[in-house]
Amino acid sequence: MQVLVRDNNVEQALRVLKKRMQREGIFREMRARESYEKPSEKRVREQAEAVRRHRKLEKKKMQREGLLPAPKKAVRTR
């Protein structure tokens, strides 16, 4: 993966690199390869992730239909 450094702005180049790596899923893959995961553990983890995704989609669907209140937006202070 290659990132251009413009005007010696290394911080910006690092941000761009991190964003690209996040989008490509490299961080998740690195974490997964740190140690061996048994196939049974992998199945359990993937099933739990699928359940979480399904619940999240159902919650969003109910919010769109007006059955649940919309989530409150966090107030950011600087």
Curated annotation (Swiss-Prot):
Alphabetical UniProt keywords: Ribonucleoprotein, Ribosomal protein
Q: Which GO terms describe its cellular component?
A: ribonucleoprotein complex; ribosome
Which Gene3D superfamilies does the UniProt entry name for this protein?
Ribosomal protein S8
* Region described as Disordered: 54-78
In terms of Pfam families, this protein maps to: Ribosomal_S21
The terms under GO molecular function for this entry are: structural constituent of ribosome
One GO process term, biological-process aspect: translation
Identify the NCBIfam families for this entry. S21p
Please give the family membership noted in the entry: Belongs to the bacterial ribosomal protein bS21 family.
Its recorded name reads Small ribosomal subunit protein bS21B
- Organism in which the protein naturally occurs: Agrobacterium fabrum (strain C58 / ATCC 33970)
Q: What lineage is this protein's organism placed in? A: Bacteria, Pseudomonadati, Pseudomonadota, Alphaproteobacteria, Hyphomicrobiales
